[in-house]
Amino acid sequence: MLSRNVPKGDYLWGITRRIVDTNPGSDCVLDHVETNAMHRSARGALAVLLPLLLVASSARAQVPLPSSFVDAATVVDGLVLDMRYFGDHNFVGEKIDGYERPLCLLSAQAATALAEVQRSLAARGLGLKVFDCYRPQRAVAHFVRWARKIDDVRRKSEFYPDLDKRVLFEQGYIAEHSGHSRGATVDLTLVRRADGSELDMGGPFDFFSPKSWPSDSSVSVQAQQNRALLAQAMTRGGFRPYDKEWWHFTLANEPFPDTYFDFPVR
């Protein structure tokens, strides 16, 4: 066991020091030369072992991507990415925990199904643009912490102008778990393949309001038609919609219905 109050980088020297000091009443006393030699020996050992220990520590920190998950952009031809939680253009106003790269990770089954949707839209000159895919549980925890900070309303005007932040949990906008963490849910919209411009959906992604409900009739007729087109393409591809968010779809036959993953997006 290591001695207490020993700096992490000096743990070998801490062990050596304890060996020397454990029996102060002993007749065996190390002289100055022997002590210096011990110092040099310990430091030499540390110089050799520390890089190895750092590599081992790094390896433990590098949580591998499960073999059942893929980078959807390598499966879905022409998929447009706008990964909102990798940056600060989101309802929190900052990069979200767990998003280390702007990738769309999905279970292999969900990515394959999404590729079929993309192919079906190509005939119309349309394609898919994703905002979020797999979401680590630590990201959900970040949302929960933010929701409890009632005074943090940096993005209120853009994402929840008509909503009191204190009702986010009550009204279901924020929860302790998210289907995204199971790897088969995706937030997305439609774009024109010619120029990448988004179709009018009557409101932005992550807008906390009944106006985001797919059935909301207060948006323009064109927006209603575009929402219906997206929903039709996704349901035909094997996804089910969510009645509170026009952009949110989950693979009906998801492979991990009871598992909430927490590996980082990297």
Model-found features: residue ranges?
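Bacterial N-terminal signal peptides
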Residues: A45-A56
